[in-house]
Design a protein with these regions (language model features):
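N-terminal signal-anchor transmembrane segment
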Residues: 2-77, 95-105, 157-158, 372-374
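Aromatic-anchored transmembrane helix interface
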Residues: 60-66, 87-100, 107-130
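Alpha-helical transmembrane segments of multi-pass inner-membrane proteins
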Residues: 140-166, 178-241
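Interfacial loop-to-transmembrane-helix boundary motif in multi-pass membrane proteins
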Residues: 25-31, 85-94, 127-154, 200
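Hydrophobic transmembrane alpha-helices and their immediate junctions
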Residues: 334-373
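Transmembrane alpha-helices of multi-pass inner-membrane enzymes
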Residues: 367-373, 382-409
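A membrane-periplasm/extracellular boundary helix in multi-pass inner-membrane enzymes
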Residues: 156-161, 239-281, 300-303
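Long extracytoplasmic/lumenal interhelical loops at the membrane interface
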Residues: 46, 276-337, 353-357
Length: 409
């Protein structure tokens, strides 16, 4: 709410202690939403037992129970259920409506359950919308803190039991079963956000150096090419958005160019070997088997309704194999409608960022939106409750005007 309306309603200003309490509750709500979309299996990614065994029922109760807890916390912090008008959330809400339409004729309870879960997830995002656009980057910092906690447990697992954390040759969670692609995503997004904030003089140099060293090590051990490509492209786009105003950006680009040239000349064989991950030509051309699954998605028999609206929310797999593409997964679950809405939401964020005045919030939004765009081709997916939907929402939240909502304080 604008300060003018707040004064009209004669709402008293909140004290520092109350403001800290509000920030904590908003941050906790965001952390619970991240916990809700974390992967859980009763074993590590490579099939080994966890360092601290967690029964399957308890692990699923933690992740699935995080959403009701997030809703409760969001209602506590936003008791009047005030929401900020948002085109982005309006588009995402269309996916919820479409999911419930499919749920009316669902053959499996899982489709109905996932529809309600998506509805609750998006409702929680609506309840957090009054805190969008804050100058202190509250939601961005909350996301960085949350992902840092997840990565800390991953690194701790690597220290305690390297054989479990590096099972299968890729770094995954040994305390909590975070798979390598999600570990790499968290490391890449955290690194990208911190670097962009440092470029805009909103993060300390020593802190950025520490985060960079740890995140690069995690990315190296996770062997996830998509995350690295999305990170590089995202930082490049974000840097271009402020290269004319920040000398630090120009120095970074020049330094990276020199280092990249030296690496290409002296270590090209090592880098190529790491990127190949021991895969043959057939695996590379099929994107590690993804193209066969994508072809299976396209070839599934459909009637006209299913072409337009899909089969309903699922675990995004075909014949037991993950789809690993936001666009093909959207087509499977939500049809052409889901693809159009997902593309519209992403395009809205990018276009809004283009017309937003230059600044750190615009650069952060461009990094997140670009990261999601690059990753969307081989990862799922901001058409359902996921970390990618949270990150795209985070980008949208940075592009709204700053303001203080005193009715909530």
């Amino acid at each position: 709410m604008s300060p003018l309306v707040a004064r009209t309603l004669r709402i008293p200003a909140a004290g520092p202690s109350h403001e800290r309490s509000v920030r904590f509750r908003v941050g906790l709500t965001w952390a619970l939403l991240v916990l809700n979309v974390l992967t859980f299996y009763p074993h590590t990614w490579s099939g080994q037992p966890l360092i601290l065994p967690i029964p399957s029922a308890i692990g699923k109760a933690i992740t699935q129970g995080a959403l009701p807890a997030a809703l409760v916390m969001a209602v506590i912090v936003n008791r009047r259920l005030i929401v900020r008008p948002s085109v982005f959330l309006g588009l995402i809400s269309l996916l919820v409506v479409e999911a419930f339409i499919n749920a009316l004729q669902a053959r499996h309870f899982g489709t109905i359950y996932r529809s309600f879960r998506l509805g609750g997830f998006v409702f929680a995002l609506w309840l957090l919308s009054p805190w969008w656009g804050r100058r202190d980057l509250l939601l961005v910092r909350s996301h960085v803190i949350t992902t840092t906690v997840v990565l800390s447990f991953t690194v701790l697992g690597l220290i305690v039991s390297p054989s479990r954390a590096l099972g299968g040759g890729r770094l995954g969670g040994a305390f909590w079963p975070t798979p390598p692609p999600q570990v790499a995503e968290f490391a890449a997004v955290t690194l990208g956000l911190v670097v962009v904030m440092w470029l805009a003089a909103r993060f300390s140099g020593w802190g950025t150096l520490f985060v960079t060293c740890i995140a690069v090590l995690i990315l190296y051990l996770s062997h996830t090419r998509t995350a690295i490509l999305a990170l590089v492209v995202g930082i490049f786009v974000a840097g271009l958005s402020m290269i004319s105003a920040e000398a630090r950006v120009r120095k970074l680009f020049a330094s990276v160019g020199i280092v990249a040239t030296l690496v290409a000349v002296t270590l090209s064989g090592v880098v190529t070997s790491w990127l190949l991950r021991g895969e043959g030509t057939q695996q590379l051309t099929s994107l590690t088997g993804r193209t066969a699954t994508w072809l299976a998605v396209v070839n599934i028999p459909r009637n006209l309704f299913q072409v337009i609206f899909g089969f309903g929310l699922s675990n995004k797999s075909v014949n037991g194999l993950p789809v690993d593409s936001n666009w093909l997964a959207s087509f499977l679950d939500q049809g052409i409608f889901g693809i159009v809405v997902s593309a519209s939401a992403l395009l809205f964020v990018l276009v809004t960022a283009y017309f937003t005045p230059r600044g750190v919030k615009r650069s952060l939004a461009l990094f997140l939106a670009t990261y999601c765009l690059v990753a969307s081709f081989t990862e799922t997916g901001f058409s359902d409750a996921s970390t990618y939907l949270l990150e795209l929402t985070l980008a949208a939240s940075l592009l709204v005007p700053s303001g203080v909502n005193r009715r909530l304080e």
